[in-house]
Amino acid sequence: MAFTQFKHSGTLNPEISVCEKKHSSFAEKAAEEGIVLLKNENILPISLSASVALLGIGADKTVKGGIGSGDVNNRQNITIYEGMEESGIRITSRDWLDDYEHRYQKARLIWKEKILEEAKHVNNPFDAYASNPFIMPEGRPVSEMDIQEAEIVVYVISRISGEGKDRRLEKGDYYLSEREEKDILFLNSRSVPIVLLINAGGPVEL
């Protein structure tokens, strides 16, 4: 019996290939050119020497793409936090980001346990996964302490989008969550300039 030999995209080689390097460079360019600037009130571009309070659920848990068939396996995801820090920008909100990391990991654990429990009672375990898309938890309220050392605030609104996770006409999905609304109103009442970023694969009503 003859077998047809074929090449596949998977690899066990830990070395980054020339192909990966080219694709990574192309993906970075596509991301840069795909950013849409809706409004700029003499804040952007941010100076690399600036002190920035980086806040919001997508700051260090940046959504890289879709889910389901829209997901891809890649070696590295660079978050907004990592990108800004690598550029030399001083991030002053590490306490807020650390607190959100704890909330995020706790939410992921609860989500995982729920799926594993439901999988025991269905014929196809994948159904338990598909019917329970992960929802990013809210962060703690932004306080005066979080912005006291900042020259600029960058607040990131993120939404998970993709197969099985379309926008819903609810707060925290298509609409801002109550937490996001309160945070933005609080920040707007202060004298520090604000940059609002939307990190989502679908529309969000502001």
Language model regions located:
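C-terminal non-catalytic regions of proteins with extracellular/luminal or membrane-system context
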Residues: 1-206
